[in-house]
From Swiss-Prot:
UniProt key word Repressor: no
Similarity-based family: Belongs to the class-II aminoacyl-tRNA synthetase family. Type 1 subfamily.
Record's subcellular location: Cytoplasm
Organism: Clostridium tetani (strain Massachusetts / E88)
One GO MF term attached to the UniProt entry: transferase activity
One GO cellular component, as annotated: cytoplasm
Protein name (database record): Aspartate--tRNA ligase
PANTHER family, per the entry: ASPARTATE--TRNA LIGASE, MITOCHONDRIAL, ASPARTYL/LYSYL-TRNA SYNTHETASE
Known catalytic reactions: tRNA(Asp) + L-aspartate + ATP = L-aspartyl-tRNA(Asp) + AMP + diphosphate
Length: 592
């Protein structure tokens, strides 16, 4: 049984002791990282969240403390009191490496079984074991460092937005289900049998209502929930930095959030972000990078070849161009020597994105090697090489298709794939931000034969494009903007519709009947009858921001208690079966 503190107080954290503390008397508390018995001396590395301190016990210093120290094992929780002295052998790898604590008394606050995972940095353990014993995994210094960064980031966000006169307002966790996009997590109501709350996918409607309420500037660091199939860096519950502003246009929102990004990165990790951040229209992002999340850390941009091939007699390209399709290419520098098998693998890769194949031209010193060279004239080959600005040793990779989206997406993904394969991003700690703007307001779902909102139904169209809502909705651009960092979406937002008639028109374009629109969003439409201000906002993915600030590529590392890939918690075993009594109270019967 562990000993009680009985009034004993910790005077300093283990990791805070330095040379200036020599000759001071201190009490430290923490966990045993390691113990070494050298006969008449016992050395214990004691660890707390601030670091590791070496504690030395000697028979001649205090025999009782020495004998008790000999009984401790890894991860025992201790309180040790003694004098800070200079170490004989300095450990330059530790901030506390100049000093040690000479143990005069020791309390074993609790004992520990042999841990199923070793508490160290760079742990090589199966993810499910780490998640099952998460409380041990979180003792590791690298995990504690990440969660400290998370705390510092949240504080920096609050400090900045407070200076900008934003108010932090909490919005409901139990709200109305408005099924659009991802599935809602539903919560049955005991008071209203057969009815359900939904956990919010975002506070979108409430923050707009706060603008109608006259709060002017709102923010919240808030939990959101989506019951969707999990990808590598998705979690069923995640955190957003959510904000909204009244009486603003797009430039105002972008300016505010650029300064927020600059403040956070400088104050949390000391990195300077140059402003203003580059802006790129959606169409340019897609045509040059094949993605609405362009990674600007390397080149290999997509080039369109339609103009140089418009007169070609090569049947494959000619049919595509004549039928309104497109031909585009990327250039892999110094890859002309790539083997046929490697190139064939690249062809298989683009086929996973619906491309029909991959043509290629290797520009070698003594020849131009290509399976399509015999179908092209010398002038066409030269025009392609000139258009791609290819040098001797470069490899040109070409995709053609009737659908521009297939060409853009397949080359965009191939571009990213090659960057990894060629090591273009290795040891690259550059931060390349870009705003992507002028998104399409809606896109056409061919399977369901209807228009869908690209962001959400409350995004305002660009003023000059409103005229196309009735005749050509696909032509309408949105007042939407995403902030992208190194090819990852860090956040997104828009200027909102604040006019009831325009909002009703938007619902009409999306195929909502008036009755359906009022059933789902009547409270918002009703609020818009009472003088709503122009407003807009943005939400950052807080977890993803922490990934960039801490340098980890796994979202589970930035969340204290995450779920696994199957949305299951190995530690608590949630979700779990509940009692029949609880289900009966809710009027729920489980279908077998």
């Amino acid at each position: 049984m562990g000993e009680a503190l009985k009034g004993l107080k910790r005077t300093i954290m283990c990791g805070q002791l330095r040379e200036e503390n020599i000759n001071e008397q201190h009490t430290v508390m923490g966990w045993v990282q390691r113990k070494r018995n050298l006969g008449g001396l016992i050395f214990i590395d004691l660890r707390d969240r601030d670091g590791i301190l070496q504690v030395v016990f000697g028979e001649e210093i205090n025999k009782e403390a020495f004998e008790k120290a000999d009984t401790v094992r890894s991860e025992y929780c201790l309180a040790v009191t003694g004098k800070i002295i200079k170490r004989q052998a300095v450990n330059e790898n530790l901030p506390t490496g100049i000093v040690e604590l000479q143990g005069e008394s020791i309390k074993i606050l609790s004992e520990s079984e042999t841990p199923p995972i070793y508490i160290k940095e760079d742990l090589d353990a199966a993810e499910n074991i780490r998640l099952k014993y998460r409380y041990l995994d979180l003792r590791r210094p690298d995990m504690q460092k990440i969660l400290k960064i998370r705390h510092k980031t949240a504080k920096a966000v609050r400090d900045f937005l407070d200076k900008e006169e934003f108010l932090e307002v909490e919005t409901p966790m139990l709200t109305k289900s408005t099924p659009e996009g991802a599935r809602d997590y539903l919560v049955p109501s005991r008071n209203y049998p057969g009815m359900f709350y939904a956990l919010p996918q975002s506070p979108q409607l409430f923050k707009q209502l706060l603008m109608v309420s006259g709060f002017d500037k709102y923010f919240q660091i808030v939990k959101c929930f989506r019951d969707e199939d999990l990808r590598a860096n998705r979690q069923p519950e995640f955190t957003q930095i959510d904000l909204e502003m009244s009486f603003v246009e797009m430039d105002d929102v972008i300016d505010l959030n650029e300064r927020l990004i600059q403040y956070v990165f400088k104050n949390v990790v000391g990195k300077d972000i140059k402003l203003p951040i580059e802006r790129m229209p959606y169409k340019i992002a897609m045509s040059k990078y094949g993605s609405d999340k362009p990674d600007l850390r390397f080149g290999m941009e997509i080039e369109n070849l339609d103009d140089v091939l418009k007169e070609t007699s090569f049947k494959v390209f000619k049919e595509v161009i004549d039928n309104g399709g497109t031909v585009s290419a990327i250039k892999a520098e110094n890859c002309a020597g790539m083997g046929r098998k490697q190139i064939d693998k690249l062809g298989d890769f683009v086929k996973t994105f619906k491309a029909k194949g991959l043509a290629w031209i290797a520009y070698k010193e003594d020849e131009i090697k290509s399976p399509i060279a015999k179908f092209l004239t010398e002038e066409e080959l030269k025009s392609i090489i000139d258009k791609m600005d290819a040098k001797v040793g470069d490899l040109i990779l070409i995709v053609s298709d009737a659908k521009e989206k297939v060409v853009q997406q397949s080359l965009g993904q191939l571009r990213l794939h090659l960057a990894k394969e060629l090591g273009l991003l290795k040891d690259n700690d550059e931060l390349r931000f870009v705003w992507v703007t002028e998104f399409p307001l809606v896109s056409y779902n061919e399977e369901e034969d209807r228009w869908e909102a690209e962001h959400h139904p409350f995004t305002a169209p660009m003023d000059e494009d409103i005229q196309y809502l009735d005749t050509d909705p696909g032509k309408v651009r949105a007042k939407a903007y995403d902030i992208v960092l190194n090819g990852e979406e860090l956040g997104g937002g828009s200027i909102r519709i604040h006019d009831t008639k325009l909002q009703e028109k938007m619902f009409e374009v999306l195929g909502f009947t008036e009755e359906k629109a009022w059933e789902r969003f009547g409270f918002l439409l009703e609020a818009f009858k009472f003088g709503p201000p122009p407003h807009g906002g943005l939400a950052f993915g807080f977890d993803r921001m922490i990934m960039f600030l801490s340098g980890t590529e796994n979202i589970k590392d930035v969340i204290a208690f995450p779920k696994n890939q199957n949305a299951f918690c190995p530690m608590t075993e949630a979700p779990n079966v509940v009692d029949e009594v609880q289900l009966d109270e809710l009027g729920i019967k489980i279908k077998k």
